[in-house]
Regions:
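Catalytic core of DAGKc-family lipid kinases
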Residues: 11, 36-37, 44-45, 84-87, ...
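ATP/NTP phosphate-donor binding region
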Residues: 1-66, 76, 187
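Short Gly/Thr/Asp-enriched flexible loops that form oxyanion-binding sites at enzyme active sites
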Residues: 74-86
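ATP/nucleoside-binding phosphotransfer catalytic cores, i.e., glycine-rich phosphate-binding loops
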Residues: 23, 183-184, 189, 214, ...
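Glycine-rich beta-strand-to-loop/alpha-helix junction loops that act as flexible
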Residues: 16, 69-71, 91-93
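Short conserved active-site loop signatures built around small residues
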Residues: 72, 195
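Gly/Ser/Thr-rich active-site loops/lids in small-molecule metabolic enzymes
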Residues: 154-162, 203-232
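Glycine-rich phosphate/pyrophosphate-binding beta-alpha loops
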Residues: 139, 143, 196-209
Length: 257
């Protein structure tokens, strides 16, 4: 995708707080490579400016690509602002970088520059949870409680050990309320204590909760677990690691709209 007289702008949406350390050096390197290929590049860090610049550039039909320089949260933020035909590339600067790993993006920005210029594209489904856009997955229950505590306590870069105290707090305080789940496959609500909804088969630490989720079938993959306790959490974890959990009577899996 060599730059034309119109579509020659690349917007890099950089999250300065993503991951354990700053990845600004990689952003600068990619910028220099693209400018050498006659692209115009804008590096933006303000949420409001990122949104406005993306929308205005699309209206002017000059936007060649958006680069998400951050973690999965950065990608989730810019996704709703991109038209379906606007390509998005990733510089993985976050803690887990699930979507980048799934699509094969790495910190090798020379390869990323080649992908941007060659124009290789892949269309993906997206989901909505409480009105919020997501590409990877959404969860309800203990997992979501931990993540909420992490983000409420966040003051800067997130490292893996940033989850330690929120995890311990959730272990102490979480009471596993009953969840009611409705899907297009059932007239009655399912009842569970844990619920995971996947668009792509990725989860933290590579846990294969739904290893066959399809990113382009127009549906989402549900995995729910009926029992809630710390002991049962370890049992479910063992089952997931062995790939046996979906055969258990208290675990429900389905693909639904």
């Amino acid at each position: 995708m060599s730059p034309t007289s119109v579509k020659n702008l690349v917007i890099i949406a950089e999250n300065p707080r993503a991951g354990a350390t700053s990845g600004h050096r990689l952003v600068v390197e990619l910028t220099e490579m693209l400018e050498a290929l006659d692209y115009r590049v804008r590096i933006l860090t303000s949420v409001e400016e990122i949104q406005t610049s993306i929308q205005e550039a699309q209206l002017r039909e000059e936007l060649a690509c958006i680069v998400s320089a951050g973690g999965d949260g950065t990608l989730r933020m810019i996704g709703p602002w991109a038209d379906p035909e606007t390509p998005i590339a990733i510089i993985p600067l976050g803690t887990e970088n699930l979507m980048a790993r799934y699509l094969g993006f790495t910190v090798d920005v020379a390869t990323t520059a080649k992908w941007i210029t060659k124009g290789n594209r892949r269309k993906l489904d997206a989901g909505l949870a409480n009105g919020q856009f997501f590409l990877v997955m959404a969860s309800v229950g203990f997992d979501a409680d931990v993540v909420t505590r992490v983000h409420e306590a966040r003051t800067g870069h997130i490292r893996h050990w940033s989850y330690a105290l929120p995890l311990l707090t959730s272990i102490r305080d979480y009471r596993y309320p009953e969840l009611r789940i409705r899907s297009s496959n059932h007239r009655r609500s399912l009842r569970a204590k844990w619920a995971f909804v996947f668009n792509v088969p990725m989860y933290a630490m590579g846990l294969p909760i739904v290893p066959d989720a399809d990113d382009s079938d127009g549906r989402l993959d549900l995995c729910s677990m009926r029992n809630g306790s710390l002991l049962r959490a370890f049992v479910y974890l063992a089952g997931i690691l062995m790939g046996r959990h979906r055969y258990w009577n208290d675990v429900h899996s389905e693909r639904a709209e």
